Curated annotation (Swiss-Prot):
InterPro entries: Helicase_ATP-bd (IPR014001), Helicase_C-like (IPR001650), P-loop_NTPase (IPR027417), SEC_C_motif (IPR004027), SecA (IPR000185), SecA_CS (IPR020937), SecA_DEAD (IPR011115), SecA_motor_DEAD (IPR014018). NCBIfam families: PRK12904.1 (NF009538), secA (TIGR00963). It is an enzyme of class 7 (translocase). Its cofactor is Zn(2+). Gene3D superfamilies: Helical scaffold and wing domains of SecA, P-loop containing nucleotide triphosphate hydrolases, SecA, preprotein cross-linking domain. Monomer and homodimer. Part of the essential Sec protein translocation apparatus which comprises SecA, SecYEG and auxiliary proteins SecDF-YajC and YidC. This is Protein translocase subunit SecA.
Length: 904
């Protein structure tokens, strides 16, 4: 019997059906315009672009321009690439332009789809960012689709790491910019450490199209981008602690694989105290619970996590004396990305490689908050519907399933569940042999490098030629994936999310065409494609006769989305294909979430060695377990976002003020307001309201005025005067400081004074914000314990972080006021030297952002990749970026502000 919801959908259609239906008249308009645009010359296509630009500037909406613009873009793509966009690709582009996520199945041509929405929105001249998951795809797509944009008269750029700054600024100034999500986020942070407007990369955040949007906005949502600087070296502590961990017994800790957490038991804590005392890490009489034990306990906890939660060749690999993390969703290496809070150092100690110093945060942002900066955001992926609720709640993005150009002919078989992993792999080997014997290409999906290499060894012993795609073969990725659809091909891949290259039966025609065009840019794209397709036809026919691509997965992932991405590699563009999952009760997901019930079923059925249970309810049971995991992860991301939103509001205020300062011509009003506010604070502190004169702290006020305001006025005499009140003293201080600064401006010259004010303000903001970030990190790490006292940690964090922010602003005002009061007239050379010194200190911080060394919470962090440079008192770039109250890097023992950081 049909449910009410099912009957309703049959009568009225689903919301998705209605959205698709609404675009059909627009697609019909575009198709009707096609003959008109086919008649245009190459120059005529560019002239149309100029016409559209003019109409947009005159107020015509992009929606009104869409049919003509899409028709123009379709014709340009046909001429430049030999590709005529399908109606379904145009439909996907409409959804992108409307600010949705377009779910297009693998092989439906997302790369070309994006060009239409990018072209239309690029007509405004405000820039469009097309976001990819790796630099290879960014460069490939920019070169490939750049020919289309070029034919239309738009400029295309690609921003990637390690490129010259001038070239990167030019790339961002293009109409269309391709870049990875990491590079965009880091460049945003770098921009907010710059001191001159002409150094800025990202002028505005107009429209972003995010490819593999689920990978970037869901899987990496908990990953903060962090620009960091070096802190003190604790490598010996990590080595000492690492020697302790192997002595820990199983009853000394509790491991929760569901939450990926490990903690010491009471027995473990007792054992720790004993062994740490023996190692000299705890002093006689010192307990683990003493405040002074915090650091060593933190190191021990991270050491335990490194040994019990992180596995070599699954979570990371060791390459060239470095621990390189592996993306659990894509299987790619993530060079330069480091775990935070000393966890990466603990893994380095575990593996016996060089231990790099921990880093301190200079600037950070999450992908969630970075991509919410854009005026309009859209995305593409083959799998988004399972996360539709999160996309809408977090980003305000709707998900629309775009119809396939041809019906899907792939057969998705029920899961086969074996009792042991050995039985499962033996069954998989037989399946691979069977398919390979008839020439059917096989794509074998695994979840770790270790398992992919184990399967590879089994195939070698069986004499089956094959390719392996995992983090170790990262560089050959595109070619391995492109060849996976060839006759008789066997490919083992560790996760297929965001691979970017299409698996086409018989081989990837698009990649061959692109390679040929790169080798001969003057070749006719349509003729070249026709020639390659003719050669490819026989190969494809053989593969079709063998049954198409067979996807064989060795495990289910925690996310249904990742499983669907693997399945979706087969059956592209209506091709035949097959997919199946071979599982065992020893698999991680089965073991953690559902093996007990299945174990009973298997025993009841009395399955023999090598037999498997195959039934639809097994699939449903696993999908329910996956759904629970997805829901839990969504809740974690929501909670983390609530905390990050607190910092994000403060970040927007600071970065906004910073940009205003950089754009301002005259900052004297701002610095005057700061100075007056400092005076108000002094009056309130030392001459409290509603108090008598004999209760005032005149000596404290006098000392503060001398130190902070740089004036020597008879405060002690003023307070003795008959009838004088706090307001009168305030006015005298304001008058005296205003007079002082007016004199300084006259002595320096107005232009020099404005430059000094700007540089001092920017330096103070950067220093105070960096210190504030560190304070917030510490607060965030301990605020969770407030829950034990029946206090909401989030509210506690909000309240205390606001108070800390207010305190930071007070400190900022005092710092700027004090520095401005201390400057004295200099020669022109001295003035320039001081400005250059301040800029050099800022440049040192920016230099930390230039290299790809980074990390936090498994997040990317940009930081210094080289060893510390020796201090040179004549070269400020070697000074690092110490805070005003930190020790001077010259090792004089003085505070930086009293030594080389002195501004006099």
């Amino acid at each position: 019997m049909l449910g009410i919801g099912t009957i309703s959908r049959k009568i009225f259609g689903s919301p998705n059906d209605r959205k698709v239906k609404a675009t059909r008249p627009v697609i019909a308009q575009i198709n009707a315009l096609e003959p008109e645009f086919e008649k245009l010359s190459d120059e005529g296509l560019k002239e149309k672009t100029e016409e559209f630009r003019k109409r947009a500037l005159e107020g015509e909406s992009l929606d009104a321009l869409l049919p003509e613009a899409f028709a123009n873009c379709r014709e340009a793509a046909r001429r430049a690439l030999g590709l005529r966009a399908f109606d379904t690709q145009l439909m996907g582009a409409v959804f992108l332009h409307q600010g949705n996520i377009a779910e297009q199945k693998t092989g439906e041509g997302k790369t070309l789809t994006a060009t239409f929405a990018a072209y239309l929105n690029g007509l405004t001249g405000r820039g469009v960012h097309i976001v990819t998951v790796n630099e290879y795809l960014a460069k490939r797509d920019a070169a490939w689709m750049g020919s289309v944009f070029g034919a239309l008269g738009l400029t295309t750029g690609v921003a990637y790491s390690d490129m010259p700054e001038d070239e990167k600024r030019k790339a961002y100034a293009s109409d269309i910019t391709y870049a990875t999500n990491n590079e965009l986020g880091f460049d945003y942070l770098r921009d907010n450490m710059k001191s001159e407007l002409d150094q800025i990369y990202q002028k505005q955040h107009n429209f972003a199209i995010v490819d593999e949007v689920d990978s970037i906005l869901i899987d990496e949502a908990r990953t903060p981008l962090i620009i960091s600087g070096p802190s003190q070296d604790r490598s010996e502590m990590y080595k000492t602690v690492d020697a302790v961990i192997p002595q820990v017994r199983d009853d000394h800790f509790e491991l929760d694989e569901k939450t990926r957490n490990v903690t010491f038991t009471d027995e473990g804590n007792e054992f720790l105290e004993e062994i740490l005392h023996a190692q000299g890490l705890l002093e006689e009489g010192q307990s683990l619970y003493d405040p002074e034990s915090t650091t060593v306990v933190h190191h021990v906890n991270q050491g335990l996590r490194a040994h019990k939660l992180f596995q070599r060749d699954k979570d990371y690999i060791v390459r060239d004396d470095n621990v390189v993390l592996i993306d659990e969703f894509t299987g790619r290496m993530m060079p330069g990305r480091r775990l935070s809070d000393g966890l990466h150092q603990a893994i380095e100690a575990k593996e016996g490689v060089d231990i790099k110093p921990e880093n301190i945060t200079l600037a950070s942002v999450t992908f969630q908050n970075y991509f919410r900066l854009y005026d309009k955001l859209s995305g593409m992926t083959g799998t988004a519907l399972t996360e539709a609720e999160e996309f809408m709640e977090i980003y305000g993005l709707g998900v629309v399933e775009v119809p396939t150009n041809k019906p899907i002919a792939r057969v998705d078989e029920d899961d086969q569940v074996y009792r042991t992993a050995r039985e499962k792999y033996e069954a998989m080997l037989e399946k691979i042999k069977e398919s390979n014997a008839k020439g059917q290409p096989v794509l074998v999906g695994t979840t770790s490098i270790e398992k992919s290499e184990m399967l590879s060894n089994m195939l070698k012993q069986a004499g089956i030629t094959h390719n392996v795609l995992n983090a170790r073969q990262h560089e050959q990725e595109a070619q391995i994936v492109a060849d996976a659809g060839k006759y008789g091909a066997v490919t083992i891949a560790t996760n297929m999310a965001g691979r970017g290259t299409d698996i086409q039966l018989g081989g990837n025609v698009d990649l061959q065409v692109m390679n040929a065009l790169t080798a001969d840019p003057d070749a006719d794209p349509e003729a070249l494609r026709a020639s390659i397709e003719a050669q490819h036809a026989d190969e494809k026919a053989k593969v079709l006769a063998a049954g198409g691509l067979y996807v064989l997965a060795s495990e289910r992932h925690e996310s249904r989305r990742i499983d669907n991405q693997l399945r979706g590699r087969s059956g592209r563009q209506g091709d035949p294909g097959r997919s199946s999952f071979f599982l065992s009760l020893e698999d991680d997901l089965m073991r953690i979430f559902g093996s007990e019930r299945l174990e009973k079923v298997l025993k009841t059925l009395g399955l023999k060695e090598g037999e498997a249970i195959v039934h639809p309810w097994v699939n449903k049971s696993l999908e329910r377990a996956q759904s629970k995991v997805e829901g839990r992860n969504f809740d974690i991301r929501k909670q983390l976002l609530k905390f990050d939103d607190v910092m994000n509001e403060q970040r927007k205020v600071i970065f906004g003020q910073r940009r205003e300062i950089m754009e301002a011509k005259d900052l004297s009003e701002i610095t005057t307001d700061m100075r007056h506010q400092v005076i108000d604070d002094f009056i309130e502190q030392y001459l409290p309201p509603n108090t008598y004169a004999d209760q005032w702290d005149a000596e404290g006020l006098y000392a503060a005025v001398q130190e902070q305001l740089g004036i020597d006025v008879p405060v002690m005499d003023w307070v003795e005067e008959e009838g004088v009140d706090d307001e009168a003293i305030r006015e005298r201080l304001v008058e005296a400081t205003d007079k002082l600064m007016t004199e300084k401006a006259g002595q320096f010259g107005a232009e020099n004074m404005r430059n000094i004010e700007k540089q001092l303000l920017l330096q103070a903001i950067d220093t105070k914000w960096r210190e504030h970030l560190l304070t917030l990190e510490h607060l965030r790490s301990v605020v969770g314990f407030r829950g034990y006292a029946q206090r909401d940690p989030l509210n506690e964090y909000k309240n205390e972080s606001f108070q800390l922010f207010e305190s930071m602003l007070d400190s900022l005002r005092e710092d700027v006021t004090q520095k401005l009061s201390q400057i004295r007239p200099m020669t022109e050379e001295e003035q320039q030297a001081m400005i250059e010194q301040i800029r050099a200190q800022q440049a040192a911080a920016q230099a930390a952002a230039a290299g790809p060394t980074v990390s936090a919470q498994a997040g990317p962090v940009a930081g210094p990749a080289d060893a510390a440079v020796a201090f040179d008192e004549n070269d400020p770039s070697t000074w690092g970026n110490p805070g005003r109250n930190e020790p001077c890097p010259c090792q004089s023992g003085k505070k930086f502000k009293h030594c080389h950081g002195r501004l006099i």
